[in-house]
């Protein structure tokens, strides 16, 4: 993987990730394909929304179908027939979200398989091996996603262990002869001094890109913005920056304003299945009765298949009848909305008009522009 940085506007960056499998224009949004599928979508449909890279989930694919089934097909690309690049998370977030059924040690994490209850062990080395077998174009280190709230002492211990695990991840990744990219994950909760230690430690180890982890886990939005403003300038400018698990459209806008290049989140797909649709002027909750006889398109400014062909009334009807097509059409639209948003941000950065774009984005939704505390 090669990262090319074209231009900046304030702290926002316009560039691209270059892989053997294709080019990803940045800032980018990665749809989430947890089980080897972006829910309800064929790879061709996902690509048609403008997505150039997707995310796969190491933890879930390890449990089902497992490494051996994956290797029978070649790798995850062959298994799911996605031709572009794939980023896989390390499994850390899923393991730590298991709560009481897992035990963290210095060596790794012991837990019960949530499918059948069998005891399982996952550590940095195993995570690197699974992601190698998946053929991931971007591999994420195995870390502990520090929960929120966490006091300073806990956050420090967690961050320091994640740094030790980062070194073990790097060593196993290299020993496998993996020629793809490996990203480090910055931890430290909402504490700037801990984030400083994490960034320096990861940069000393050396990675192809750097993710900001442990945000969007319940902390106030102001804290997320503050940490991004503090951390992003410390990440080497020639490496991509990835904000994990984020988020709402406004979170993408605010991340880009602070220097983030990559995002992922289940929100557009999960919300689509619940009739929660993102449009230029805000949100449409399509199951509301007021859309029963609305013959207009979902979003007159959207060029997706759904908006070009169907009315709000039809989408309302499908939702009320629990028709699978409704979830699919909603997903097509939400994914396209996110890709159109990212394309708009990229164009605005190219033209040096990002703040004008941001102001228009919020004004059209009747909202104030959040403060930006950067030099």
From Swiss-Prot:
Is Metal-binding among this UniProt entry's keywords? yes
Which cofactor does the UniProt annotation name? Answer: Zn(2+)
* Entry keyword Metal-binding: yes
Binding-site list for Zn(2+): 302, 304, 307, 333
Q: Which keywords has UniProt assigned to this entry?
A: Glycosyltransferase, Metal-binding, Queuosine biosynthesis, Transferase, tRNA processing, Virulence, Zinc
Q: State the EC number(s).
A: 2.4.2.29
Free-text cofactor note: Binds 1 zinc ion per subunit.
Q: Which GO terms describe its molecular function?
A: metal ion binding; tRNA-guanosine(34) queuine transglycosylase activity
Question: So where does substrate get bound?
Answer: 89-93, 143, 187, 214
* Active site per database record: 89, 264
Which pathway is this protein assigned to?
Answer: tRNA modification; tRNA-queuosine biosynthesis
Pfam families noted in UniProt: TGT
> Catalytic activity annotated for this protein?
7-aminomethyl-7-carbaguanine + guanosine(34) in tRNA = 7-aminomethyl-7-carbaguanosine(34) in tRNA + guanine
Q: GO biological process: any one? A: tRNA-guanine transglycosylation
Task: Identify the InterPro entries for this entry.
Answer: ArchSynthase1/Queuine_TRR, TGT, TGT-like_sf, tRNA_ribo_trans-like
Where are the residues of the annotated region RNA binding? 245-251, 269-273
Q: Name one GO cellular component term.
A: cytosol
User: What disulfide bonds does the UniProt entry report for this chain?
Assistant: none
User: What family, per the record?
Assistant: Belongs to the queuine tRNA-ribosyltransferase family.
Output the NCBIfam families linked to this UniProt entry: Q_tRNA_tgt (TIGR00430), tgt_general (TIGR00449)
Its quaternary organisation is: Homodimer. Within each dimer, one monomer is responsible for RNA recognition and catalysis, while the other monomer binds to the replacement base PreQ1.
Function in brief = Important for virulence.
Name of the protein in its database record: Queuine tRNA-ribosyltransferase
Gene transcribed to yield this protein: tgt
């Amino acid at each position: 993987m090669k990262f090319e940085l074209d231009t900046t506007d304030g702290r926002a960056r316009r560039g691209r990730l270059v892989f053997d499998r294709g080019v990803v224009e940045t800032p980018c949004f990665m749809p989430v394909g947890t089980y080897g599928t972006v829910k309800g979508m064929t790879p061709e449909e996902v690509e048609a929304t403008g997505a150039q890279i997707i995310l796969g989930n190491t933890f879930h694919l390890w449990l089902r179908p497992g490494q051996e089934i994956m290797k029978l097909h070649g790798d995850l690309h062959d298994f799911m027939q996605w031709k572009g690049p794939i980023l896989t998370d390390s499994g850390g977030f899923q393991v730590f979200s298991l709560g009481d059924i897992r035990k963290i040690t210095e060596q790794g994490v012991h837990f019960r398989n949530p499918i059948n209850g069998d005891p399982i062990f996952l550590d940095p080395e195993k995570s690197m091996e699974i992601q190698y077998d998946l053929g991931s174009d971007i591999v994420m280190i195995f870390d502990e996603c520090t929960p929120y709230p966490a006091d300073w002492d806990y956050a420090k211990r967690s961050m320091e262990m994640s740094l030790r695990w980062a070194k073990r991840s790097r060593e196993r990744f290299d020993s496998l002869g993996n020629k793809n990219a490996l990203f480090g994950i910055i931890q430290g909760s909402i504490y700037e001094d801990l984030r400083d230690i994490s960034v320096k430690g990861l940069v000393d180890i050396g990675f192809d890109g750097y993710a900001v982890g442990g945000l969007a886990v319940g902390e106030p939005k102001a804290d997320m913005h503050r940490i991004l403003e503090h951390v992003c300038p410390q990440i080497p400018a020639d490496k991509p920056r990835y904000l994990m698990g984020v988020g709402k459209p406004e979170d993408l806008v605010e991340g880009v304003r602070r220097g983030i290049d990559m995002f992922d989140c289940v929100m557009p797909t999960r919300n689509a299945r619940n009739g929660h649709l993102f449009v230029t002027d805000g949100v449409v909750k399509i199951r509301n009765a007021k859309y029963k006889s609305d013959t207009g398109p979902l979003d007159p400014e959207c060029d997706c298949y759904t908006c070009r062909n169907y009315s709000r009334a039809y989408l309302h009807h499908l939702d009320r009848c629990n028709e699978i097509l409704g979830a699919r059409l909603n997903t097509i639209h939400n994914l396209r909305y996110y890709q159109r948003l990212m394309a708009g941000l990229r164009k605005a950065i190219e033209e040096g008009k990002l703040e004008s774009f941001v102001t228009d984005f919020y004004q059209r939704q009747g909202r104030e522009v959040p403060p930006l505390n950067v030099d």
